[in-house]
């Protein structure tokens, strides 16, 4: 697989969820081995409540490696500040800034415009 495909797969796993805000649970999700590869609790992670299409669309016509802002707002859940892997959870609706590599989202930069 090309590197972009692998990075996009990783991005989808780490940042895109089909769960509704009401059903989403930071503690359950963040304690999954996918988010704790070295056994450490990740300090913060933002999840985009969306299908993959609108997120990938942000990177359409993005050549090379570049940060791009979404043109639409997404529903987001941020899991942060774990104390013994118990997370605080906050929900918001906002634009997102992501790193694109050759038309694929590969890194979540921040909530809000770039």
Swiss-Prot record:
Active site residues according to the UniProt entry: 15 (proton acceptor), 107 (proton donor)
InterPro entries: RNaseA, RNaseA-like_dom_sf, RNaseA_AS, RNaseA_domain
Gene Ontology CC annotation, any one: extracellular region
Keywords: Disulfide bond, Endonuclease, Glycoprotein, Hydrolase, Nuclease, Secreted
GO molecular function: endonuclease activity; nucleic acid binding; RNA nuclease activity
Chain residues that bind substrate: 42-46
CDD domains: RNase_A_canonical
Glycosylated residue positions: 27, 67, 91
Broad class of the protein's primary localization: secreted
Keyword Repressor: no
SMART domains: RNAse_Pc (SM00092)
Localisation: Secreted
PTM annotation, UniProt: There are at least four different forms arising from glycan heterogeneity.
Domain of life: Eukaryota
GO biological process: defense response to Gram-positive bacterium
EC id: 3.1.27.-
Top EC class for this record: hydrolase
Disulfide bridge positions per record: 26-79, 41-85, 59-100, 97-114
Subunit comment: Monomer.
Task performed by this protein: Endonuclease, hydrolyzes highly polymerized RNA, poly(U) and poly(C), and the dinucleotides CpA and UpA. Hydrolyzes 18S and 28S ribosomal RNA. More active towards rCA than rUA or rUG. Has cytotoxic activity against cultured human submaxillary gland carcinoma cells.
Family assignment from sequence similarity: Belongs to the pancreatic ribonuclease family.
Stated name of the protein: Amphinase-2
Species the sequence originates in: Lithobates pipiens (Northern leopard frog)
């Amino acid at each position: 697989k090309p590197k972009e495909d692998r990075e996009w797969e990783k991005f989808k796993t780490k940042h895109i969820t089909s769960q509704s805000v009401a059903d989403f649970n930071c503690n359950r999700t963040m304690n999954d081995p996918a988010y704790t590869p070295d056994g450490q609790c990740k300090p913060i992670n933002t999840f985009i409540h969306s299908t993959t299409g609108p997120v990938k669309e942000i990177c359409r016509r993005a050549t090379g490696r570049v940060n791009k802002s979404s043109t639409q707002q997404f529903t987001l859940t941020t899991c942060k500040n774990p104390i013994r892997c118990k997370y605080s959870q906050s929900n918001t609706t906002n634009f997102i800034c992501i790193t694109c590599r050759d038309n694929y989202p590969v890194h979540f930069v921040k909530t809000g415009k770039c």
